[in-house]
Amino acid sequence: MAAEAAGGKYRSTVSKSKDPSGLLISVIRTLSTSDDVEDRENEKGRLEEAYEKCDRDLDELIVQHYTELTTAIRTYQSITERITNSRNKIKQVKENLLSCKMLLHCKRDELRKLWIEGIEHKHVLNLLDEIENIKQVPQKLEQCMASKHYLSATDMLVSAVESLEGPLLQVEGLSDLRLELHSKKMNLHLVLIDELHRHLYIKSTSRVVQRNKEKGKISSLVKDASVPLIDVTNLPTPRKFLDTSHYSTAGSSSVREINLQDIKEDLELDPEENSTLFMGILIKGLAKLKKIPETVKAIIERLEQELKQIVKRSTTQVADSGYQRGENVTVENQPRLLLELLELLFDKFNAVAAAHSVVLGYLQDTVVTPLTQQEDIKLYDMADVWVKIQDVLQMLLTEYLDMKNTRTASEPSAQLSYASTGREFAAFFAKKKPQRPKNSLFKFESSSHAISMSAYLREQRRELYSRSGELQGGPDDNLIEGGGTKFVCKPGARNITVIFHPLLRFIQEIEHALGLGPAKQCPLREFLTVYIKNIFLNQVLAEINKEIEGVTKTSDPLKILANADTMKVLGVQRPLLQSTIIVEKTVQDLLNLMHDLSAYSDQFLNMVCVKLQEYKDTCTAAYRGIVQSEEKLVISASWAKDDDISRLLKSLPNWMNMAQPKQLRPKREEEEDFIRAAFGKESEVLIGNLGDKLIPPQDILRDVSDLKALANMHESLEWLASRTKSAFSNLSTSQMLSPAQDSHTNTDLPPVSEQIMQTLSELAKSFQDMADRCLLVLHLEVRVHCFHYLIPLAKEGNYAIVANVESMDYDPLVVKLNKDISAIEEAMSASLQQHKFQYIFEGLGHLISCILINGAQYFRRISESGIKKMCRNIFVLQQNLTNITMSREADLDFARQYYEMLYNTADELLNLVVDQGVKYTELEYIHALTLLHRSQTGVGELTTQNTRLQRLKEIICEQAAIKQATKDKKITTV
């Protein structure tokens, strides 16, 4: 048990320490330090027991694992043998290596010599290959340049020059080749820059021309010959910017997706098929040539000149296109071709700008990437491009708008120049008939000579264009020469009206491209604004003033009438004043300018107001010159000016009927009685207003030409008022369109202020009022003439005559009145429309009748011969008026019957009233009875006369009562 315990102790110790040497040292220390022999013996015994225990355990384990132990021992033996063999072999190899080393050491110098010779031979072979390749560079370079594979050519040339100036510098045989390739390298960038400019300015714009041709072919199939090539009102607004998609094929990437480093050149494809990629290749080639600064400088220097060449090419293209359509710009004023030119230039300049944005993107890549190994390269930007485009457009507009006034001094205005013949008026106001295409009987264009000649000329033009990038015209180029410059239309200020809206849209595109805010304007807008405000408006005003003054500042502006051609074109039946037509033409011209230059509508409307006001003043002065004599108005003008009289006359049915034709007037029962009552009211007012005063000759218009002038003024001012009202109503209507309707009208007019509209309406109304006053003056003047001649007839005439030859003659005053009325009728029939002519003479018979009947009180005496003479006077007046009015003029029968009533005695007159009833007023009967008392003998004393007068009044009252009773009975019956 003790042995087992000892063995367990030692096992545990061994297991804890896992170091037998440590256990042995511990036992030795215990034995050596112990003073007691017994303890040492005990320790020794425990140790021996432990060893024995270990031997037994080991024997048991060996017995238990004998097979495994045997196998392990055998395996160990085989491994040991193999290791021993390997050591022997390694030793042998080391000995062999040492032997080889010794042998190689002996051949070292010989091997080194051979190795160096091998390297030298290899280098020589490489140099020979390189020389052979360099000798082929000129030929390959020429092929690449011919096929326009410039990137490959650049790489080849740069590497060849580097080789010739590097490793092959000492090769004397390559000196000529070195000079040749060096010269090519020095000039290659010029070729690349030229190609870049060709794509920037010719290739990019050729697509625009091609698209326009395709559009023209399509439109020519569907459009009518009368439709203009370009309609300003249907232009797209705003035009879309030309993006980079125009410079790439369908399968290529856009510019923003291509980096300059990623651009590769495909030798199998046409390099110019994709313009965007081709320009990238050119920029990459220039970067490899380290010529980016020179490229930028060349682009900046050539920009303006290239843009001018685009203008020149486009001018010839537009003229050529117009020539092919059969238009001759040297004969016709064709501002439409200028519009076509500008539209083409806008598209081309947009294309150029888009191409420049592509190039700038590539140039910025060259600055950012270390491709060029250059620093501080200053590039241009898109603002520089747009500034040059604006400069070129300004120069073009300066020429076409004739801002230097090179032609205005020698040529009359194309817009406001009219000869006194009036043919130009007719041309202006004529309705433009749609032009029918003329069917030619035959053509020479398909003859062999024409075909060969056309083909030859077409080939010549194509060759010249491809060589210089500039379209060449024929012998005359179908262009207008002007100081070394060719134009598609005659330069003039009015060209701005056709191009204003497209130009304004292009300016908006420029400002959008430059990112300008509302507060900042581009130079082209400033140029346009300054031109219109400082030059165009003043020029228009000067032209208008010149034309209006030409017809209003004459000695007698109311005598100058438009000719028959103008009247026919205007559709008027009576002549108009030439000055009125000029003013109306001016107003229409200004309104057209307001639509063409909508941004300046207020200025043009103000001009309209000023010109109309000036013309109103002119007409007022001319009117006063006719109706005013020695600071005093003639009676007719004074009555027309009187508000009460004019209001009364305008309230009468004959004035209201004048506004509509007779066949359109509503039918009225007892219309004749109604109109007769109106005539009676008018006569009563006029007779009452004049009284028994005689009218001196200076208070009437004796000159028929003055009356004719008033008639012409009436017709002219009424026509002007109608035209201006129509124009102004269209203007106000156009401002009130709904948004849906406004989308179809491209006027873009700003709203017209209420003040201006009110002023325009008041001016139109004032012209109508003045026209009405002229007509009233004519209406009244004829009646004043009747007063002038017929009142002296009763007051100063001698009608107490005996029967003789003198009694058979008409009164001289009646003859003069008839003569005046006939002269006025002749003048009015030629100057006034029929219904106005009728207005002047209708009711005149009634007035004459009233004057003659009222004049009975002024006769001192009247005899039967005088009564007969008076009846003859009435008859001749009635006959004359009947010829004028084409009606019976029964009112004069009424006057004749009144004087025939004087054949009776005073008592017979009273009986006549009882028998026939009351036909005249009480006062008229009293005048007749009183005249009989003065004229006849044996009429009794004054008391008897008064008795008759009293009896007359009683009879009239009785007749009035009977008439009223009869009327009441009729009403009751109904």
Swiss-Prot record:
Q: Pfam families, from UniProt?
A: Sec8_C (PF20652), Sec8_N (PF04048)
Q: Which InterPro entries match?
A: Sec8/EXOC4, Sec8_exocyst_N, Sec8_M
- Protein name, as recorded: Exocyst complex component 4
Keyword annotations for this protein? Acetylation, Cell projection, Coiled coil, Cytoplasm, Cytoskeleton, Exocytosis, Phosphoprotein, Protein transport, Transport
Q: What biological-process GO terms show up in the record? A: chemical synaptic transmission; exocytosis; Golgi to plasma membrane transport; membrane fission; mitotic cytokinesis; paraxial mesoderm formation; protein transmembrane transport; regulation of macroautophagy
Q: What is the effect of changing A599T?
A: In a colorectal cancer sample; somatic mutation
Signal peptide (UniProt feature, chain positions): none
* PTM sites of type Phosphothreonine: T233, T237
Instruction: Kindly list the GO CC terms recorded for this protein.
Output: centrosome; cytoplasm; cytosol; exocyst; Flemming body; growth cone membrane; membrane; microvillus
GO molecular function terms here? PDZ domain binding
Q: Which residues carry this modification: N-acetylalanine?
A: A2
Give the family from UniProt.
Answer: Belongs to the SEC8 family.
Q: Where in the cell is it found?
A: Midbody, Midbody ring; Cell projection; Cytoplasm, Cytoskeleton, Microtubule organizing center, Centrosome
Residue ranges the record marks as coiled coil: 32-114
The chain residues annotated with the modification Phosphoserine are: S32, S226, S468
State its role: Component of the exocyst complex involved in the docking of exocytic vesicles with fusion sites on the plasma membrane.
What organism does the UniProt record list as the source? Homo sapiens (Human)
Q: How does it assemble?
A: The exocyst complex is composed of EXOC1, EXOC2, EXOC3, EXOC4, EXOC5, EXOC6, EXOC7 and EXOC8. Interacts with BIRC6/bruce. Interacts with MYRIP. Interacts with SH3BP1; required for the localization of both SH3BP1 and the exocyst to the leading edge of migrating cells. Interacts with SLC6A9.
Encoding gene, per UniProt annotation: EXOC4
N6-acetyllysine modification sites? K9
